[in-house]
Design a protein with these regions (language model features):
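A long-range scaffold signal marking pre-active-site subdomains of enzyme folds
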Residues: 25-28, 46, 85
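Helix-loop-helix
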Residues: 1-40, 74, 164-169, 183-198, ...
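Soluble non-transmembrane domains of integral membrane proteins
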Residues: 66-311
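Outer-membrane beta-barrel proteins
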Residues: 3, 53, 62, 152-154
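Intrinsic low-complexity, intrinsically disordered segments
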Residues: 47-73
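Short extracytoplasmic/periplasmic juxtamembrane "stem" segments immediately C-terminal to an N-terminal membrane anchor
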Residues: 33-54
Length: 574
């Protein structure tokens, strides 16, 4: 690698390391004491409400509705979701994937409303089953002969969507007309083997009515967000591959407060809460319509609802998101339609990406060869002027570059132009649920690391395992560096730095998904092939002849903007 190419790679590495550090999960987790305290406070609130209504809490039975994708269990105490099982998915250990699991947990979902001047929490009420089919149920709590409240759940076929309605009858006689409040608390259960990596993708998303989708920080130990000036359409407790979302269909959520905190336990990674206001009951029969999304974070499925739920999938910002949305996902889905192995799909995706980037690779390689040809003359100029006159040194460099028709940063710029595509795939592949628990060769799960060696101790910057796919990627990068150094003649610190950078990638990517490392590995292999192909048609002798021919051409008057800028920088250094 020549100096300018190395500078370009260093620039990419610095961005990559900074990105990784910014999104690195914080290991200083909040202890379970905070969660316990919150649970006690919540129970105290329920007791206060219960004393107003005189309703006794008891352990009730579960009523189920299901389709081929999920099973929803609803408790007749509170008429609330007790369990949501995704039938087509499994946890990393092969056990049932419970997206909502209220066993041994303080999960809760309820409404607080005014009934005859008293504050009532619905999670303390006993509900009676009024009607039930395979896909819908109606539960009712009767306050008296003239007043009751119905909870209706209905589940469509082939869908993760659950329609939910709360209908009040005769509860509009309150003089205060207080807003109805909704509360939802959920302990987020770890579904993946790499808990810390999953935690870094777990957060709360929300969509204001008149603003873009937003979210809480994934890396903070504890976050509270109050939205007292914005009406919100939906709120979602989002994990890496799954989401539990509530969407307000006929009103909007007001005066929202959302909280989340890291939990240090063997099974729970975060605790999330939502509280919000709804309009008060002001007519004899008032219905609040919602729907839940309990399902996978699949871009196509979420986009179908046309309310921005797909924004939860972290595809990157600005141009990165556009590249992923319009190019990467479209081509990925096209290959997926042929029912290929996902490892093969990643390889084919890599081939297409490298072909698209081939003009930049070609330009970078040609520029590198040009700088190699000019190296003896560059060294001669440096030996003549050295550090005595930096301005004169830069002027002589510019004369040489101009006469030879060479851009000294020609090898660096193409590398920088590749950054959006490189980072687009860096965001897409770890978020692609299609890779979850899909095998390829020795890799059991392309969505997580392939730990071929598990260490009995923690190695700083590496972890407690060695990923074979990451190791192969690192070796291929070292080979690529060695081959380039042989032709570029780079020496000294630049040569050493070229070998250090792949080792940094080993530490950074060792805990990243095997699918991502598979992409980088084959990207290196294809680059080898491309450079071998380029060498067939380009030689240093040909480049040298073109440079000499360019020197013989009459020089154009005036200086280029690039040359003027370099000379200005040289003057500033004096």
């Amino acid at each position: 690698m020549d100096k300018n190419t190395t500078i370009g790679i260093i620039f990419i590495v610095l961005i990559f390391v900074g990105w990784s550090m910014f999104f690195q999960p914080n290991n200083n987790n909040t202890s379970t004491n905070s969660n316990t305290e919150q649970s006690l406070n919540h129970n105290q609130e329920k007791n206060n409400l219960e004393s107003n209504t005189g309703t006794r809490i008891k352990h009730g039975s579960l009523i189920s509705i299901e389709n081929n994708l999920l099973k929803l269990d609803i408790s007749d105490v509170g008429a609330k979701p007790y369990s949501v099982i995704l039938k087509a998915q499994k946890r990393y250990d092969g056990t049932t994937l419970n997206l909502i699991d209220s066993r041994n947990s303080n999960n809760n979902f309820y409404f607080s409303l005014d009934v005859n001047g008293k504050k009532v929490a619905t999670d303390t009420l006993d509900f009676e089953l009024i009607s039930k089919t395979d896909s819908a149920i109606v539960l009712r709590h009767q306050f008296n002969s003239n007043q009751h409240i119905d909870f209706t759940y209905s589940l469509s076929k082939e869908s993760y969507k659950i329609d939910f309605a709360v209908t009040t009858y005769g509860l509009n006689n309150s003089s205060s007309q207080l807003p109805v409040k909704i509360y939802w608390t959920n302990n987020i259960r770890a579904q993946e083997e790499n808990r810390e990596y999953e935690r870094s993708y777990t957060t709360t998303y929300y969509k204001p009515i008149n603003a873009d989708t937003d979210y809480l920080s994934e890396t903070s130990d504890q976050v509270t967000k109050k939205l007292d000036k914005e009406d919100v359409k939906w709120v979602s407790f989002k994990q890496r591959f799954f989401s539990a979302s509530i969407i307000n269909e006929n009103y909007s959520f007001k005066n929202i407060e959302i909280k989340q905190e890291n939990i240090d336990s063997s099974d729970i990674i975060k605790h999330m809460t939502l509280s919000a206001d709804l309009p008060g009951v002001n007519i004899p029969q008032q219905t609040y319509k919602f729907w839940f999304y309990f399902g996978i974070n699949n871009y196509k499925i979420l986009e179908h609802f046309n309310i921005g739920l797909e924004d939860q999938i972290p595809l990157g910002w600005g141009p990165l998101r556009w590249i992923n949305k319009w190019a990467v996902i479209s081509f990925f889905n096209l290959l997926d339609s042929y029912h290929l192995n996902y490892g093969i799909i990643i390889i084919l995706l890599t081939v297409v990406v490298r072909l698209v980037l081939f003009p930049l690779t070609y330009s970078s390689y040609v520029s590198q060869v040009k700088m190699q040809v000019l190296k003896p003359e560059i060294d001669a100029i440096k030996a003549k002027f050295g550090d005595k006159d930096q301005q004169k040194l830069q002027q002589e460099y510019m004369k040489l570059y101009k006469s030879a028709g060479v851009n000294p940063f020609g090898g660096c710029i193409p590398l920088i132009l590749q950054i959006p595509i490189v980072f687009a795939l860096f965001r897409f592949l770890p978020s692609a649920i299609e890779l979850r628990q899909k095998s390829f060769l020795w890799v059991d799960d392309l969505s997580t690391y392939d730990a071929v060696i598990k260490l009995p101790f923690n190695v700083p910057f590496v972890g407690e395992h060695i990923s074979l796919m990451c190791l192969l990627m690192t070796i291929s990068t070292l080979i690529y560096t060695w081959l380039n150094n042989r032709t570029s003649g780079v020496t000294g610190q630049m040569r050493i730095l070229g070998y250090i950078m792949p080792l940094l990638f080993l530490g950074i990517l060792n805990s990243f998904p095997a699918g991502l490392n598979l992409y980088y590995l084959f990207s290196n292999i294809i680059t080898f092939a491309q450079q071998a192909f380029i060498r067939i048609f380009i030689s240093q002798d040909d480049i040298h002849k073109k440079i000499q021919d360019h020197k013989k051409k009459p020089s154009k008057k005036g200086k280029s903007l690039f040359q003027k800028k370099l000379e200005e920088l040289a003057k500033q250094r004096r």
